[in-house]
Regions:
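Acidic donor-binding/catalytic loop of UDP-sugar-dependent glycosyltransferases
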Residues: 51, 101-113
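Short aromatic/hydrophobic "clamp" motif used to bind/position activated sugar donors
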Residues: 94
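C-terminal subregions of glycosyltransferases and related glycan-biosynthesis enzymes
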Residues: 188, 192-274
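Conserved nucleotide-sugar donor-binding catalytic segment
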Residues: 137-210
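Glycine-rich, basic loop-to-helix element that forms the pyrophosphate-binding segment
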Residues: 72-89
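A conserved acidic beta->alpha catalytic loop
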Residues: 15, 22, 45-55, 74-75, ...
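Short beta-strand/loop segment that forms part of the nucleotide-sugar
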Residues: 32-47, 69-73
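Short, well-formed alpha-helical segments that are part of the catalytic scaffolds
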Residues: 12-31
Length: 274
């Protein structure tokens, strides 16, 4: 078993060292516990203007076994960086880690026996055959709209050809909906391995603009298009569940952006006065 840990980064010099430390620790733990397994760490520069790229280069000089440096198109966003990372990946499973987050030391060891297309710590707990209607019914509502790039591991062979869209936010929701729609097997409710920091200033979750509002709306419509063809005849109340998901997504992730966007616009206008 080999893992490809993909870390997109841009202007993350404050958090990237801690992130890398956690991933390297998980890779070392894997090598010690499961000598037949391995990991590669693919750090993709999404257009940093700070010292992030230099930090990765310094780490690569001391640990060339684990760190691969690559460039994504400048200002193309996290989706393009993840796409570039997938192009370079050679592992059996893909694990995505944001540069302002960390993973637990036992993260990769806990995934070393994975065989499913998707392995997530989200509920429901168990192993599900997604080629059967009961598998889709049990997992659709809890996962669609909640499954993100970082809260699951994905079998690389099942990912083939699936790309993150060019959106400034919520691009991973579109990708995970597409992945869920094509997956044949899923394991849920495993022990959490990811440590998400929602409070890091400048992180994607804390960056707001009018452009993000438009991107969030675009993501909701793409999510619908991604999952709809896969569920005909599966007994899933697709329209009711998806509309509820989209409404929640709209309220929580789109309308919540509007006051911030308006405040930013008012501030820009005041700042532009003579």
């Amino acid at each position: 078993m080999k893992f490809s840990v993909i870390i997109p980064f841009a202007n993350a010099e404050a958090t990237l060292p801690t992130c890398l430390d956690s991933v390297v620790a998980a890779a070392d733990r894997l090598a010690a516990a499961r000598p037949a397994c391995g990991a590669e760490i693919i750090c993709v520069n999404g257009g940093s203007r700070d010292r992030s790229a230099a930090l990765v280069a310094a780490r690569a000089a001391h640990d060339g076994r684990l760190v691969v440096r690559a460039e994504a198109p400048r200002e193309a966003g996290a989706g393009a960086a993840r796409n570039r990372g997938m192009d370079l990946a050679t592992g059996d499973y893909l694990v995505f880690v944001d540069a302002d987050d960390t993973i637990a030391p036992e993260a990769l060891v806990s995934l070393a026996d994975a065989t499913a297309d998707i392995v997530t710590f989200l509920p429901p707990q168990g192993t599900f055959d997604l080629t059967r209607p009961e598998g889709r019914r049990a997992t659709f509502s809890p996962l669609v709209g909640n499954l993100l790039a970082w809260n699951a591991a994905y079998r690389r062979a099942a990912v083939a050809g699936l790309r993150f869209p060019n959106l400034c936010n919520h691009e991973d929701l579109v990708w995970t909906c597409g992945m869920y729609a094509r997956a044949k097997t899923l394991v849920g409710g495993v022990r959490p391995w990811y440590r998400y920091d929602a409070h890091v200033a400048g992180s994607a979750a804390n960056s707001h603009s009018g452009r993000r509002v438009a991107a969030a709306w675009a993501a909701t419509s793409r999510m619908w298009r991604a999952v709809r063809p896969a569920f005909a005849g599966n007994g899933v109340r697709l329209r009711a569940v998806m509309l509820r998901k989209l409404a929640m997504h709209l309220v929580l992730h789109v309308l919540a952006e509007v006051p911030r966007a308006l405040a930013a616009r008012r501030g820009a206008r005041r700042g532009g006065r003579p």
